């Protein structure tokens, strides 16, 4: 099982809540994924609506909510969003996202580190979205983050793990959970993330914008279950030369 802070997760699949055509499809997809943690944007939530079916349904389930600070352009805005989320959702878990430019939504490492320090000191369980940069990941560990969430590729691109070399360094060196976030575009991308040693993946666009989000969510669930079983079974090493599986003898000994 995966442990983040004081919480255990059976599923290695975390899912987002954006881009769905309706709340109904979103909820069906979340339940089909069997994810135990979902992330949601503070900016999109109507906390004053007592008829918020989405939040009511999730609060009745055992799924953990991970509010995010998406849209924050600096540390000050991110800290404010985190405090609003804590008050509104009664959780000290926060996915820290700071991306000041809007075309590629790349994380601001400097502001992320500043905000992480403040939030950890204020009692938050901080999971920062960050570059696949081993140096910044080490710094985020040092300030007390509970996991790191390096991007596979830019948000919403579905390009997969375009920086897997650096991801492998992070996986080798970092001793807290590593969740590959952003760019996971297919179940095979998610499988690769687990096979190289990541602890979990966060998927949104690939599920929400597919032709059938419910079936796609289920396919990610099955793929990650298979990936975890394979990893725990001990994947066979790779080789650039052939290794015969049968004895090399004279054919039929004629």
Curated annotation (Swiss-Prot):
Pathway(s) the chain acts in: Cofactor biosynthesis; thiamine diphosphate biosynthesis
Entry EC no(s): 2.8.1.10
Catalytic activity as recorded in UniProt: [ThiS sulfur-carrier protein]-C-terminal-Gly-aminoethanethioate + 2-iminoacetate + 1-deoxy-D-xylulose 5-phosphate = [ThiS sulfur-carrier protein]-C-terminal Gly-Gly + 2-[(2R,5Z)-2-carboxy-4-methylthiazol-5(2H)-ylidene]ethyl phosphate + 2 H2O + H(+)
Residues at the catalytic site: 95 (schiff-base intermediate with dxp)
Top-rank taxon: Bacteria
Matches recorded under SUPFAM superfamilies: ThiG-like
Binding site for 1-deoxy-D-xylulose 5-phosphate: 156, 182-183, 204-205
Gene3D superfamilies reported for this sequence: Aldolase class I
Classification via InterPro entries: Aldolase_TIM (IPR013785), Thiazole_synthase_ThiG (IPR033983), ThiG (IPR008867)
GO cellular component: cytoplasm
Pfam family, one: ThiG
Gene Ontology terms: biological process: thiamine diphosphate biosynthetic process
EC class of the enzyme, as a word: transferase
Keyword terms, alphabetized: Cytoplasm, Schiff base, Thiamine biosynthesis, Transferase
Location of this chain's protein in the cell: Cytoplasm
One function term, GO molecular function aspect: thiazole synthase activity
Presence of keyword ATP-binding: no
Protein family per UniProt: Belongs to the ThiG family.
Purpose of the protein: Catalyzes the rearrangement of 1-deoxy-D-xylulose 5-phosphate (DXP) to produce the thiazole phosphate moiety of thiamine. Sulfur is provided by the thiocarboxylate moiety of the carrier protein ThiS. In vitro, sulfur can be provided by H(2)S.
Assembly: Homotetramer. Forms heterodimers with either ThiH or ThiS.
Protein's name in the database: Thiazole synthase
Higher taxonomy: Bacteria, Pseudomonadati, Pseudomonadota, Gammaproteobacteria, Enterobacterales
Gene transcribed to yield this protein: thiG
């Amino acid at each position: 099982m995966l442990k983040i802070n004081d919480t255990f997760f059976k599923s290695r699949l975390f899912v987002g809540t954006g881009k769905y055509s309706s709340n109904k499809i979103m909820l069906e997809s979340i339940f089909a994924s069997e994810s135990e943690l979902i992330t949601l944007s503070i900016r999109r939530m109507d906390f004053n609506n007592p008829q918020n079916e989405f939040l009511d349904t999730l609060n009745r389930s055992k799924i953990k909510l991970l509010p995010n600070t998406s849209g924050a352009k600096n540390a000050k805005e991110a800290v404010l969003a985190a405090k609003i989320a804590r008050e509104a959702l009664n959780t000290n878990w926060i996915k820290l996202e700071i991306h000041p430019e809007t075309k590629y939504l790349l994380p601001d490492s400097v502001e992320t580190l500043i905000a992480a320090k403040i939030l950890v000191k204020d009692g938050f369980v901080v999971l920062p979205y960050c570059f696949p940069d081993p140096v910044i990941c080490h710094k985020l560990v040092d300030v007390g983050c509970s996991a790191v969430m390096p991007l596979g590729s830019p948000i919403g691109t579905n390009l997969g793990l375009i920086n897997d070399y650096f991801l492998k360094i992070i996986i080798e060196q970092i001793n807290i959970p590593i969740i590959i976030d952003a760019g996971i575009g297919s179940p095979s991308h998610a499988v690769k993330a687990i096979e190289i040693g990541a602890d979990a993946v966060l998927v949104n666009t690939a599920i929400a914008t597919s032709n059938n989000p419910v079936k796609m969510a289920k396919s990610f669930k099955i793929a990650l279950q298979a990936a975890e079983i394979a990893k725990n079974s001990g994947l066979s090493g790779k080789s650039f030369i052939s290794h015969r599986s049968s004895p090399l003898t004279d054919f039929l000994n004629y």
